[in-house]
Amino acid sequence: MGSRRHKNKQAAPPTLEEFQARKEKKANRKLEKGKRPSTTQGDEVSDRKKKKSKPFKKSRKEEEEVVEEDKDLPEVDLEELSKARKSLFDDEEDDDEAGLVDEELKDEFDLEQEYDYDEDEDNDAHPIFSDDDDEADLEELNAQNMEALSKKLDEEEAEEAEEAEMELVEAENMQPRADILPTEEQEEMMAQETPNLTSTRTRMIEIVKVLENFKTLGAEGRSRGEYVDRLLKDICEYFGYTPFLAEKLFNLFSPAEAMEFFEANEIARPITIRTNTLKTRRRDLAQTLVNRGVNLQPIGSWTKVGLQIFDSQVPIGATPEYLAGHYILQAASSFLPVIALDPHENERILDMAAAPGGKTTYISAMMKNTGCVFANDANKSRTKSLIANIHRLGCTNTIVCNYDAREFPKVIGGFDRILLDAPCSGTGVIGKDQSVKVSRTEKDFIQIPHLQKQLLLSAIDSVDCNSKHGGVIVYSTCSVAVEEDEAVIDYALRKRPNVKLVDTGLAIGKEAFTSYRGKKFHPSVKLARRYYPHTYNVDGFFVAKFQKIGPSSFDDNQASAKEKETAARKEALEEGIIHSDFATFEDEEDDKYIEKSVKNNLLKKGVNPKAKRPSNEK
């Protein structure tokens, strides 16, 4: 069966050479037939037919033997046999193929068959799927209608994209969404089990999607606050923040951007160096470091002295160039306040919180070692690193001093420009110091802004408003908290009407907030600039620039640090820190804490707080 089917298969078509040979042979035969007489041709054909028509005759003995054998064999029903054959092999086409065998073989090997290739070429010229109709619909492209056709194509693409987006949104809306928030029973089980960070991260991503489109994706019976509370719990569990700090940072952004901010804080910022232009140029320094096996590139167009280090075959803080003072390791965000300060040559400038000296030495380099730079820091131990960097970088116009910055201008005043990089909570540099996640409390965001306000007022009073090009104060922090940034400069604008905020002149940065959680700030606060790790790949930073337009009162200039502290505390009590917006005080609750604190102090001294005290003791 298999061998017969194999033989019935049609062979491969003849090659071009074989076909040409057959065609020539056929033509020769026609010529030979034309030369032969017709009678002879007819006789040969008839003889051939006669020979073919004569059957082969068997002898009588053979016929008798065949008949006897047929009698001995049982009778076979051919129809049943054929049905059984079909059912066994399931080959219904065998009969049809058997009838076509002779014709196929004849077509394959008949040399007299003629192929009409002209007709095939005509058929190929008219394919089934033709683009003639589409080409007819299109207009002829020329210089006049090119713009119109291009616009039409753009509109069609926009419509298709919009339809696809609508279909996607409808599909999401129609598809039932599982409830993301766990039930109370599930939360109890989660509290007992080991935290699964993978499922926590997945849940955070899903909650952010819901919060971004709460009207459509929010589950029935669930409020937005429930989603936010669950997200904050997951942030504390996944990233390791305290609930207080997580909520404070979360409120600065939209849910999606807040997640980007938290993710960026898990990654350290790139290593950056600042070229010391007092000793070299950035191009020369880059070439030298590349020759030493350092992979680097310029930070960006906004700075002409910064280089970003990707990897190095040598310790970047111990190269001969580093020891010679050709560069200093400095965060890119620390360049920003000095660029905003824009120091000029032959000016008197004060850096109120100078250690470890990155900004001070940058100021000296921009002044080309002219004028005078006062580098002050209240912490005497930190002045050691300040002095070391000043000497290594070759700054000869710098004076190091160790004063409480609130003593200015009583100590010395009349500066052309002042840079105040105020001490802060460090919420912008969590990538460097992960301890900030758990070390900062609500108390820190009350005490630190209180100090920052006093320092900023002292800086304003220490600047000479009659300076030819100066009268500038730059306030900066490495914090992203509103209490330390917008609230402080808004306070300064209210307390010192002789200053105004001006443009920082920085090429990058986001506008500061003019309102935050119901608190309205001065409209000019938007001139200040904010920097986030997830937007510019720098540490979180805040920069504001003031211009002094009038003199301060005599009392403000002569006040000491203690007097300023007393005045600030009095103002804080009157205003409730920031007009009672960020912190409220309850006297009854405070009295309880005060009484408890007094008892604890007495117990530490070994005194029984319940015992009656003598009348002469207070």
Curated annotation (Swiss-Prot):
Name this polypeptide is given: 25S rRNA (cytosine(2870)-C(5))-methyltransferase
Catalytic reaction annotation: cytidine(2870) in 25S rRNA + S-adenosyl-L-methionine = 5-methylcytidine(2870) in 25S rRNA + S-adenosyl-L-homocysteine + H(+)
CC terms in the record's Gene Ontology section: nucleolus; nucleoplasm; nucleus; preribosome, large subunit precursor
Enzyme active site: C478 (nucleophile)
Family affiliation: Belongs to the class I-like SAM-binding methyltransferase superfamily. RsmB/NOP family.
NCBIfam families the UniProt entry points to: nop2p
Gene Ontology molecular function, alphabetical: RNA binding; rRNA (cytosine-C5-)-methyltransferase activity
Region (Disordered): 1-132
Domain of life (superkingdom): Eukaryota
Composition bias, Basic residues: 48-59
Location within or outside the cell: Nucleus, Nucleolus
Binding site for S-adenosyl-L-methionine: A353, A354, A355, P356, G357, G358, K359, D377, D404, D421
Bias kind Basic and acidic residues: ranges: 80-89
Keyword Kinase: no
Species of the source: Saccharomyces cerevisiae (strain ATCC 204508 / S288c) (Baker's yeast)
Residues recorded with modification Phosphoserine: S580
Keywords on record: Methyltransferase, Nucleus, Phosphoprotein, Ribosome biogenesis, RNA-binding, rRNA processing, S-adenosyl-L-methionine, Transferase
Keyword flag Nucleus: yes
Protein task: S-adenosyl-L-methionine-dependent methyltransferase that specifically methylates the C(5) position of cytosine 2870 (m5C2870) in 25S rRNA. Required for 60S ribosomal subunit synthesis and processing.
UniProt GO BP: assembly of large subunit precursor of preribosome; maturation of LSU-rRNA; maturation of LSU-rRNA from tricistronic rRNA transcript (SSU-rRNA, 5.8S rRNA, LSU-rRNA); ribosomal large subunit biogenesis; rRNA base methylation; rRNA methylation
EC code(s) of this entry: 2.1.1.310
Comp. bias regions, Acidic residues: 64-79, 90-123
Stored CDD domains: AdoMet_MTases
SUBUNIT field: Interacts with NOP53. Interacts with TRM112.
Gene3D superfamilies cross-referenced by the UniProt entry: Sun protein, domain 3 (3.30.70.1170), Vaccinia Virus protein VP39 (3.40.50.150)
